[in-house]
Amino acid sequence: MKNKPDDRRDNVDKIQYNITKTIQNCELADEMIAKTDDEKTKKTLIEKNQRRREALDGMREEIKDEARDKKNGYM
């Protein structure tokens, strides 16, 4: 079986999609935090959003790297 060549042309788009969805999930969780009285649920959502924000930092760095590599022709 032949290996597929590494096709990174749409990586920037994929990462941007993931960033957008992660931000939407954070916003939805923030709404739930504001509406719920359940402290356990609030704590869980706050922790999850913290992990999402950390992931966003990583994705933003990754998208910069991919955009630079795309501009340079993926050499």
From Swiss-Prot:
Transmembrane intervals: none
Region of interest: Disordered: 48-75
One Pfam family here: Tlp
InterPro entries linked: SASP_thioredoxin-like (IPR017524)
Family (UniProt): Belongs to the Tlp family.
Annotated protein name in UniProt: Protein Tlp homolog
Species whose genome carries this gene: Clostridium botulinum (strain Loch Maree / Type A3)
